[in-house]
A protein has these predicted regions:
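Short, glycine-anchored, charge-dense loop/turn motifs used at functional sites
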Residues: 357-364, 386
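Active-site-adjacent substrate-binding region
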Residues: 90-91, 214, 218-322
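N-terminal capping segment at the start of a domain
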Residues: 21-70, 210-213, 245, 282-291
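C-terminal tail/sorting-segment detector
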Residues: 19, 383-405
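Residue-level detector of functionally pivotal "anchor" positions at catalytic/ligand-binding pockets or at interdomain
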Residues: 319-336, 342
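Acidic/histidine-rich catalytic neighborhood of metal-dependent amide-processing enzymes
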Residues: 104-106, 139-232
Length: 405
């Protein structure tokens, strides 16, 4: 979580609230449990969440300008890749900091393709960088464990991806790890702006940042941060929580001196809500040496319940079709020539649809087809790297990397 001046925050918030949504969507009415959603929520593992937080705090620091943050980036990329998610990419960006053009680690984006509305995206994310503003010294050697801020949120996104990557959905899902949040929401701002510039249809953005601290003796609460324009999206969240965890207090809250990546999406015209621990009694240990498991993350039950609800909300909004996926090894597909520049041939199972996506996740070509060998005209595509995706007659999904000269 980023802290900054209250006056600047209120000025920025006023500007944010004037923005208009790029797209309008209806949200599900959740008045009774879906047994499939409940089954997925029940599979959320405290042990898995704990292991992720423990691993992330084991890096000396995840500060944006240190070598270690690149190691975390690569670890996230490899973790998503092992899940078999359709597309995993590194989103690179540059930014001005202290009047100097800077680079840092990339945003890590994993995209799971929807089968019915692949161009509509449900996005969830958490920043993976950390910061220590208390201990003096060389940034490369000052520990910034960042357990609650924000290994806890990252663990929730990874756990959501671990379970939902085995399912099929109507809409596409993006699981995101943001870089450089602690110095101004830099990574998420770059990505959200790029999405808006390309008119990417984001149905809603869920942000997890600090979900593991519960003050001793205080009743557990989930506080939601959102602007009034996003009340319809927030109402979906309230209703979902009431249906699936009625004992949990869920209400709107604000922090006078802090912000997080949901604001990047608000600013660019997308509905976004931040799921957070108690806004008046959040961890006092963030940005210090003591942001560690057992001190700053002291309630794995809270982290588990927040993640369960987050997973269920994402799955419901994405439109759960089935709770298992069939084998989608790229060996089932042959593409030649690859790299290509004009026409190419796709061979595989009995195909009914071929789609091509750029690395932003946008669909740039779609062909309805029948047969196990299809010729495809790609002369209109700009040079670059793409993902070719095939849906067969049994609704199995296969993907393969495609290079256009």
């Amino acid at each position: 979580m980023r802290r900054f001046c209250l006056m600047l925050f209120m000025m920025w918030l006023g500007l944010t609230m004037q923005a208009q949504h790029l797209f309008e969507h209806d949200y599900p009415v959740v008045q009774q449990e879906d047994s499939r959603i409940r089954q997925l929520m029940d599979q959320v593992s405290q042990d898995s969440l704990y292991a992720t937080i423990d691993h992330m705090q084991s890096f000396l620091t995840r500060r944006w300008d240190t070598p270690m943050v690149y190691e975390v980036q690569d670890w996230l990329y490899e973790t998503y890749s092992r899940m078999g998610i359709d597309t995993v990419l590194l989103h690179n960006f540059q930014f001005m900091y202290h009047d100097t053009l800077q680079e840092t680690s990339d945003n890590v984006i994993a995209i799971q393709r929807g089968l019915v509305y692949p161009d509509e995206y449900v996005v969830c994310g958490a920043h993976y960088d950390s910061y220590n503003h208390v201990t003096p010294g060389n940034p490369d050697t000052v520990p910034a464990p960042g357990a609650d801020d924000n290994a806890s949120g990252t663990s929730g996104i990874l756990e959501t991806a671990r379970l939902l990557s085995q399912c099929k959905f109507e809409r596409s899902i993006m699981y995101c790890g943001w870089a450089a949040e602690e110095i101004g929401l830099i990574g998420s701002a770059a990505f959200a702006k790029e999405c808006a510039d390309h008119l990417l249809d984001i149905v809603g953005y869920f942000n997890l940042d600090m979900i593991g601290y519960l003050e001793e003796g205080r009743e557990m609460q989930m506080h939601l941060m959102y602007v009034n324009r996003d009340s319809t999206f927030a109402n979906y969240i309230y209703q979902f929580c009431e249906t699936y965890d009625s004992a949990l207090i869920v209400k709107q809250g604000w922090i006078s001196g802090g912000d997080s990546d949901y604001s990047s999406f608000n600013r660019n015209g997308y509905p976004a809500v931040h799921l957070f621990e108690h806004t008046h009694h959040y961890s006092p240990f963030i940005h210090t040496l003591d942001d560690i498991l057992g001190v700053s993350v002291n309630s794995m039950e809270q982290a588990e319940r927040f993640t369960q609800l987050h997973l269920g909300m994402v799955a419901t909004l994405a439109g759960l079709i089935s709770t298992s996926v069939d084998e989608t090894e790229t060996d089932h597909l042959m593409i030649f020539p690859n790299p290509a520049s004009g026409w190419l041939t796709v061979k595989g199972p009995e195909m009914q649809q071929i789609e091509i996506y750029n690395l932003l996740g946008q669909q740039v070509k779609k062909e309805t087809c029948h047969g196990s060998a299809v010729q495809l005209d790609v002369t209109s595509l700009a040079a670059g790297v793409y993902v070719l995706r095939v849906v067969d007659d049994a609704m199995n999904v296969y993907s393969h990397r495609l290079v256009i000269h």
